[in-house]
């Protein structure tokens, strides 16, 4: 929330600098995310008085003598501004000065005439009409004649000010206003708070047409309405326009500006209905009817449900309660009468409405954090005061106060000094506790025992709920957290911090992937149906059982992911389009599987390892090798079997990944028709290879050994034998290796090192060359032993798979 330093000074006599106040606010629990110096970009720009102005013949320039006080009384500056004249007071940027945007001004000749600076327009100082009158005039900024030459321009045009951008925590709804922060400033500086004026006079006029009925008191506990007539719309005074502009709101008209001003100053969102557009003048606050429509002030049409609260003129909705007014009742230049609304709406309902409709506004942001009834009353009174202060209307006696019960009083607690100190773990003197609570506007009455006190919280502090713990927090943030001495709990034991076994496992997995040349990616947990369409996922596939987002942040992010593959493929395509011709990426993240739809409980979150490798030189076996090394790092081996039913993978270059015979994932080359549908750069479409894979992490972890097992080093060397086999083209390599190992238990490892095809081998056949590693058990292997093993293996391959030695 943005708060203007000069605005705070209207309520508190601040005797510290903005920087010191920033520190004090932080110490009492308010983080200033940014302290903006409005004049920081301007230096050495002062008030200059043009004492002499002579047109330069043949040009549009004027040669001026400028009095800049202590900076020089006769400085020559040339200008092409048409409105310059002798006696003019205007900003003068001197030699070596800087302007917004990093512009530096230096003395230099202008069309051959010496110019020792520049005379400035309002635009060149970053000003507009809301910040300073005349700032948008074409030409130089004409300053008042009482400005003193040499005065820094920041002091003249109001740029000697600061904006505090303060982070307001969700529990401190009372501080989402200038007044709320001013209360805290007054307390931390131990200064009195000067409340904004809320007095106003009421005429005798009562409008018999008006009535207000609240049909949903659970969603609207308090609704105040006040009729104002004889409205004169026009421009707001400069002080109001300036404060609105610096806090991020544009000036519209005096009446609309009052509602925005009260929201910033008091924290109460206000709304003004144009009474000239209301037909029945019967205001009804009710739940919307199913399918009912409303067009809001920003010309957006919404279809409503009974979960939404609307303000109606009879049957016709004229505002979306707590979010935005309707277009059919907006204040216009010809408005002559209005109804002010100041209300307290149920925060949860406003949050659901704003999120559900995707209509987040300043008003809804305030209501979502909570508005007290005190703020509702104060906001209405302040708005009516401003109507009279600005002279733009007659406050009538027609007013309404619809409440679900008696106005809420401040919460009452019985608290003990000893209990507060016990919570804090330190001893804060009783008189200090009393002083702190009183300057925070708590009513405190001590009982005779000197320990018990009766405390009444301010009406605007709805966050004070649980007595002594909340009061302890209030005390310590004012007393100072630095008074707390760090100590161990009495029963505490010193332990070394560490990661859990699963955290170690995840880190190990990531390190193993990085060792294979993969970079970790972190993608959003959302994508769109189109991303699943692009992978040719069937409409009835389990991956289509997805959770849909009610209020997506983008049309491309409408569902929660059921696979990592679409996200990683999008990242790969983006890299290729950016000129990265090759790369390897992985992600270890959750997918979301609903237990049933519509959701009645939280979905299952399963951790998956997704990976993608792309580039002209990538191939299936390189990726397979990376996976084998990954498995080896966990003390297991991966086996593969042909996969022909993964819709987005090439049926001949895809495999399921097995660990201990359990299928844990799949990988392979992206199917040609899927790749053809990608938005790839034209020069890389033909030769680009993309390999995509995904492993269910939790299924994999279930197959990992519980701990390390150690074996003695082998006493005898292994023996290697190369073998070339002729097999059918369709016979997978993994099947051949599995049959070899089943035939001979002494076969420790098998490596495929060549695949060869030719007419001599035969159509539909391929030659596969393997290196077989035999490990002896209790004696060194001789050639005869190895021959016997090979014969056994060949016999098994011929019988099971019809494979012959080449």
Regions found by a protein language model. Name each.
Residues 39-43, 200-204, 262, 454, ...:
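Beta-rich nucleic-acid/ligand-interaction surfaces
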Residues 413-581, 721, 773-775, 785-806:
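Extended, well-folded interaction surfaces typified by the phenylalanyl-tRNA synthetase beta subunit core
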Residues 1-202, 206, 339, 356-358, ...:
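Phosphate-backbone binding interfaces of nucleic-acid-interacting proteins
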Residues 2, 23, 439-442, 448, ...:
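A carboxyl-terminal module marker
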Residues 47-77, 242, 246, 259-328:
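Conserved mixed alpha/beta core segments that line enzyme active sites in large multi-domain catalysts
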Residues 5, 55, 189, 193-292:
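Glycine/proline-enriched, intrinsically flexible loops and inter-domain linkers
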Residues 114-140, 154, 162, 311-409, ...:
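Mobile "lid/hinge" segments at catalytic clefts and subdomain interfaces of large enzymes
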Residues 189-214, 391-420:
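Terminal amphipathic helices with adjacent charged low-complexity linkers/tails
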């Amino acid at each position: 929330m943005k708060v203007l330093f000069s605005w705070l000074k209207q309520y508190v006599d601040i005797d510290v600098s903005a920087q010191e106040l920033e520190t004090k606010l932080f110490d009492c629990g308010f983080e200033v995310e940014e302290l903006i110096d409005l004049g920081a970009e301007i230096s050495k720009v002062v008030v200059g008085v043009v004492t002499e102005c002579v047109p330069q013949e043949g040009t549009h320039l004027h040669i001026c003598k400028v009095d800049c006080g202590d900076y020089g009384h006769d400085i020559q500056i040339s200008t092409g501004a048409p409105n310059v004249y002798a006696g003019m007071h205007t900003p003068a940027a001197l030699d070596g000065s800087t302007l917004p945007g990093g512009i530096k001004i230096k003395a230099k000749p202008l069309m051959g005439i010496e110019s020792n600076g520049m005379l400035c327009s309002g635009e060149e100082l970053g000003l507009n009409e809301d910040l300073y009158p005349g700032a948008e005039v074409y030409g130089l900024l004409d300053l008042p004649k009482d400005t003193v030459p040499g005065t820094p321009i920041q002091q003249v045009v109001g740029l000697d000010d600061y904006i505090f951008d303060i982070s307001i925590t969700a529990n401190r709804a009372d501080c989402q206003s200038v007044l709320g922060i001013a209360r805290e400033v007054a307390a931390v500086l131990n200064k009195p708070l000067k409340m904004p004026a809320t007095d106003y006079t009421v005429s005798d006029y009562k409008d018999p047409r008006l009535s207000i009925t609240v049909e949903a008191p659970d969603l609207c506990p308090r609704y105040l309405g006040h009729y104002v007539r004889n409205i004169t719309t026009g421009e707001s005074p400069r002080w109001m326009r300036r404060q609105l502009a610096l806090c991020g709101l544009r000036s519209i008209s005096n009446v609309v500006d009052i509602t925005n001003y009260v929201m910033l100053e008091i924290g109460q969102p206000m709304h003004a209905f144009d009474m000239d557009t209301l037909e029945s003048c019967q205001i009804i606050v009710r739940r919307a009817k199913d399918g009912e429509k409303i067009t809001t002030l920003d010309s957006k049409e919404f279809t409503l449900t009974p979960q939404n609260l609307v303000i109606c003129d009879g049957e016709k909705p004229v505002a979306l309660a707590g979010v935005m007014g309707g277009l059919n009742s907006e204040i216009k230049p010809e408005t002559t009468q209005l109804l002010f609304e100041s209300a307290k709406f149920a925060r949860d309902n406003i949050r659901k409405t704003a999120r559900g409709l995707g209509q987040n506004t300043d008003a809804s942001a305030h209501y979502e954090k909570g508005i007290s009834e005190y703020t509702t009353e104060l906001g209405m009174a302040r708005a009516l005061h401003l109507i009279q202060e600005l002279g733009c209307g007659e406050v009538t006696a027609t007013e309404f106060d619809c409440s679900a019960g008696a106005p809420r009083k401040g919460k009452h607690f019985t608290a003990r000094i000893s209990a507060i100190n016990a919570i804090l773990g330190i001893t804060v003197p009783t008189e200090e506790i009393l002083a702190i609570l009183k300057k925070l506007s708590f009513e405190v009455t001590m009982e005779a025992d000197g320990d018990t006190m009766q405390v009444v919280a301010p009406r605007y502090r709805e966050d004070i709920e649980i007595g002594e713990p909340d009061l302890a927090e209030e005390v310590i943030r004012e007393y100072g957290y630095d008074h707390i001495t760090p100590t161990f709990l009495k029963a505490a034991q010193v332990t070394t911090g560490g990661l859990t076994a699963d955290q170690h496992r995840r880190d190990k997995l990531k390190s193993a992937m990085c060792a294979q040349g993969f970079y970790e990616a972190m993608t959003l947990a959302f994508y769109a149906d189109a991303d699943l369409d692009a992978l040719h996922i069937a409409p009835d596939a389990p991956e289509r059982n997805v959770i849909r987002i009610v209020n997506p942040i983008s049309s491309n992010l409408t569902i929660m992911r059921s696979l990592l593959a679409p996200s990683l493929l999008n990242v790969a395509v983006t890299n290729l389009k950016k000129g990265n011709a090759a790369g390897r990426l992985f992600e270890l993240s959750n997918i979301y599987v609903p237990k049933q739809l519509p959701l009645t409980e939280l979905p299952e979150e399963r951790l998956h390892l997704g990976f993608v490798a792309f580039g002209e030189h990538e191939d299936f076996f390189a990726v397979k090798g990376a996976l084998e090394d990954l498995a080896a790092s966990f003390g297991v081996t991966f086996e593969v079997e042909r996969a022909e039913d993964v819709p987005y993978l090439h049926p001949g270059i895809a495999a399921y990944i097995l660990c201990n015979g359990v299928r844990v994932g799949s990988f392979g080359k992206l199917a040609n028709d899927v790749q053809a549908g990608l938005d790839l750069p034209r020069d890389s479409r033909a030769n680009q290879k993309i390999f995509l894979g995904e492993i269910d992490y939790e299924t994999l972890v279930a197959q990992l050994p519980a701990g390390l097992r150690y074996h003695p080093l082998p006493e005898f060397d292994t023996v290697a034998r190369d073998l070339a086999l002729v097999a059918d083209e369709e016979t997978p390599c993994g099947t051949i290796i599995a049959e070899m190992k089943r035939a001979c238990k002494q076969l420790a490892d098998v490596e495929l090192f060549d695949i060869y095809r030719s007419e001599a081998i035969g159509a539909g056949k391929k030659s596969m060359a393997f290196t077989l590693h035999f490990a002896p058990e209790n004696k060194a292997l001789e050639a005869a032993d190895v021959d016997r093993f090979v014969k056994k293996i060949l016999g098994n391959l011929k019988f099971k798979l019809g494979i012959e030695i080449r």
